[in-house]
Amino acid sequence: MRIYLIGLVAKILGIIIPLLLGVAFLVLAERKVMASMQRRKGPNVVGILGLLQPLADGLKLMIKEPILPSSANIFIFLMAPVLTFTLALCAWAVIPFDYGMVFSDLNIGVLYLFAISSLGVYGIITAGWASNSKYAFLGALRSAAQMVSYEVSIGLLLISVILCAGSCNFSEIVLAQTRIWFVFPLFPVFLMFFISCLAETNRAPFDLPEAEAELVAGYNVEYSSMGFALFFLGEYANMILMSSLCTLLFLGGWLPILDIPIFQVIPGSIWFSIKVLFFLFVYIWVRAAFPRYRYDQLMRLGWKVFLPLSLAWVVFVSGVLVAFEWLP
């Protein structure tokens, strides 16, 4: 029993510690890449080439005074960022980094991840409501509407992938892409899924809940110190999670780019990391290149474009698989 508990704790720490380090350096990478795209230098003072900037930012947030609004519901106000960050961590339980390298290899891994991601809206909307601020509440309402709208499309797009793979288990979905990655036969599904992931994680050009010009900072406007830091960590952890999800569903997870001996020597976890880093770069590139959508444009895209198209793709994929007897 003791050995089992030690192994369990080691597995949990093996996910949490690299994830927190990844989030810290993702923030630095984002600032560096955006600075390069905008012909600036970016952080370059703290440490060599600014590599210690995440540590300095973390220490700054830790030693700041947590300010609690006098009219806020204190308990819910404090629990909302904890809920957001906890859900962001729980989702990683079913993500395989290599064959067999997964915390819990569930047969319903896709459904588990979809359920956890849909719960993330509660942390945001309770934060906006408990703050008792009109800016925070409007930001939370926008975020809730945005996340719920695009979750419907994400769910239907996931069905197309599940039909092709014949399983809800992430490891089996990756192994189903041994001959060809799903990004090629399902390219429109991949595009819609990635754009929906941008909206689901409240990233540019869909970062309407945090629209600085009109809502100051959105749902976390009243947060400071570690409350703000937990929301920040949760957002970037979800970015890495969605990049991992795109990698598993469409780019073959840990499978090498080409099935040749020299590529098979490289560990699968390295291939997985390279693909995730590619998607993270695209996240940053989109933020630097595209302007923010209006709220009505965002809702129209979700309900009038992506929802009918994703439903049509489910019908089309089902028809093709049945007609050619390709059902797994």
From Swiss-Prot:
Coiled coil: none annotated. Its EC number is 7.1.1.2. The chain crosses the membrane at residues 8-28, 74-94, 108-128, 154-174, 180-200, 213-233, 240-260, 265-285, 305-325. The keyword Electron transport applies. Pfam families: NADHdh. InterPro entries: NADH_UbQ_OxRdtase_su1/FPO, NADH_UbQ_OxRdtase_su1_CS. It is an enzyme of class 7 (translocase). It comes from the Eukaryota. Keywords: Electron transport, Membrane, Mitochondrion, Mitochondrion inner membrane, NAD, Respiratory chain, Translocase, Transmembrane, Transmembrane helix, Transport, Ubiquinone. One of its GO terms (cellular component) is mitochondrial inner membrane. It catalyses: a ubiquinone + NADH + 5 H(+)(in) = a ubiquinol + NAD(+) + 4 H(+)(out). Disulfide bonds: none annotated. It is found in: Mitochondrion inner membrane. One of its GO terms (molecular function) is NADH dehydrogenase (ubiquinone) activity. It is a multi-pass membrane protein. The keyword Transcription regulation does not apply. Belongs to the complex I subunit 1 family. PANTHER family: NADH DEHYDROGENASE SUBUNIT 1, NADH-UBIQUINONE OXIDOREDUCTASE CHAIN 1. Core subunit of the mitochondrial membrane respiratory chain NADH dehydrogenase (Complex I) that is believed to belong to the minimal assembly required for catalysis. Complex I functions in the transfer of electrons from NADH to the respiratory chain. The immediate electron acceptor for the enzyme is believed to be ubiquinone. This is NADH-ubiquinone oxidoreductase chain 1. It comes from Marchantia polymorpha (Common liverwort). The gene is ND1.
